[in-house]
Every structure is written in structure tokens, then in C-alpha cells.
Amino acid sequence: MAIDYDKHIPVLLNEAVTALNIKKDGIYIDGTFGRGGHSRLILSKLGNKGRLLAIDRDPAAIAAGRNIHDLRFTIVQRPFSTIADYIAELNLIGCIDGILLDLGISSPQLADPDRGFSFRHNGKLDMRMDTTCGISAREWLKQASVQEMTWVLQHFGEERFAKRISQAIFHQNRRRLITSTSELAKLITTIVPWSNKHKHPATRSFQAIRIYINNELKEIEQVLNSALNILAIGGKLVVISFHSLEDRLVKYFINKHSKLPLPPTGISLTEKQIADLYKNRHLTLKNLGKIRPSIQEIKVNPRARSALLRFAEKLDI
């Protein structure tokens, strides 16, 4: 029996689409189409004049999107960091009523051994979101130094055993090249103890390598900055993150644009000094809060456990 790698349960589905506050004639962006769970719900709430622009850099996601036959829907393959260029091409800068980003990796990507994202399935050590370009995890591990690998595991995986893991990978690749996910996972389990029965020892390392290979954090920074320009006044930014590195970027971005700087404590400022502090500082976002999955959703979809949704609204400055 064939395995259905496209089976995917969207996390915080209703909450995310509700946060967008869909207008019947609005123009919306699903910046991480995946398998279209969020897109389909958005389309169900749009009127005949509404539009949904979907983006994904995964060829498999694009193939799935071709199955949506709706004149209000368009899907393109590109990194979401290039979203501003795409919207400029459509002459829609400042016209977007909502942007949805469901960050991280999808269930279909994890479930397909050939993608190389999971330590639970033996497959090629690839890890690229877009399999048509870039360097695979196998190729990078083959050429990276111990210092490079250590930095990646520490910064993108917060892995305490980063140096020992990196040394083991480096020396193993000198003996015989690591080519599969199971080989890499087994090597890591000889170094990292099972301190948490619910968390595989290779979790942090696989996350770190994947983030590095796909330049994920830089992608997030770029798409968030682009959102300010392409959103209409009153437009919503909705972001679902799954680990602290992602959420830290989203939280910082929203707070940066929704809070004025606090004056230094313990120092008396003149009216002019206070005026200078806030000169040319305009709030561009309204922080609308955060939402976590319900206990019921987590029971149905354990993947939702680590999810956190943050949303904001563009202000008229």
C-alpha cells in the first residue's frame, strides 16, 4: 500500500484564519502553502472578488497547490523572503489585507524519507526545502569543518554537545561518508544521552542542520520586514512558530514596531530630551496578542504542542 506523504493536519487552523479577519473582497497571502489547509479555509471565507496568493519553495507543495482549481487562487514557487518582489510585480504593494506564515517544517516533509528531514525514517540526508537548488545536508557535512558544524549546532539547535557531535561527524566522514538520516541519528545517539524520553537525542542537531541548510532564520527576518511595506492599513500579520528561535524573531519584530522605547531609568530628562527620544519614532504595528493550541487540539495533533501564534495589525502612520 502506498504511503500518503501529503497527509497533514494544519496547526491552529481556525485560530489563524480568524486572526486574519477575512474581508470578502480582500487580498491575502498564504506564505507557507504546505498542503493547503489554511488556504482552503481562507478561500471558503472569501467572496467572488477576493484573492488568495499562495507561496512555497517546496516543489511538492506547489504540485499539491495545482489541485486547487479556483480563479481567486494563485500559487507560485519562491522563498517567502522574496514576497515583496512578487507583490511589486503584481503592483499590489500596500494592498494586502493579511499575511499568514506557518513556519518550520510540515508533516509531509517529515514523513517522506527521501526529503531527509526526519531521524525517525531512514532516507537520503538532504533536508532542502527546495530540492531543485542549494546544497544538501550530506554535502555540507562532508565539507564542513568541526568549527563550522559546532557553530551551527550551538546557534540553531542550542545543542550542549555540539562540539562532540561535530567531531564525531567529521571523523566518521573521513572514514566513510554519512549518507543517510539513520546513520547520522545513530551517531548522535552515541553522544547525546536520552535525558527526555519524549525527545530524541538527534532532535536539536537535525533542527540546526535544517535551519542552516535552508537559511530559515534569515528568511523569517526578511519576510517580516517585507510585511510592513506590502500590508494595507489595517492588514493583519499572523505567524505560527514552533520553536524558540523562530518565536524570538517574531516577538522581537512585533514588539519593535508596536512599542516606543522607554526612557532611561534613574535619569531626569528635560522636555527637549524626551521629545528627541521619540522624534521620528512612529508605531507601525498594533500587537494583537498570542494564541496557544487548546488541550483538545494537542490531543488530536501532538505536533501542535510547541506551536505559538502571534498576530498584529498595521497602523496608519
Swiss-Prot record:
GO biological process: rRNA base methylation
Keyword S-adenosyl-L-methionine: yes
Record keyword DNA damage present: no
Swiss-Prot/TrEMBL keywords: Cytoplasm, Methyltransferase, rRNA processing, S-adenosyl-L-methionine, Transferase
GO cellular component: cytoplasm
An annotated Gene Ontology molecular function: rRNA (cytosine-N4-)-methyltransferase activity
Pfam families, alphabetized: Methyltransf_5
UniProt: S-adenosyl-L-methionine binding residues: 36-38, 56, 80, 102, 109
Subcellular location, record wording: Cytoplasm
Catalytic activity: cytidine(1402) in 16S rRNA + S-adenosyl-L-methionine = N(4)-methylcytidine(1402) in 16S rRNA + S-adenosyl-L-homocysteine + H(+)
HAMAP family listed in its UniProt record: 16SrRNA_methyltr_H
Protein name (database record): Ribosomal RNA small subunit methyltransferase H
Organism of this sequence: Baumannia cicadellinicola subsp. Homalodisca coagulata
Taxonomic lineage: Bacteria, Pseudomonadati, Pseudomonadota, Gammaproteobacteria, Candidatus Palibaumannia
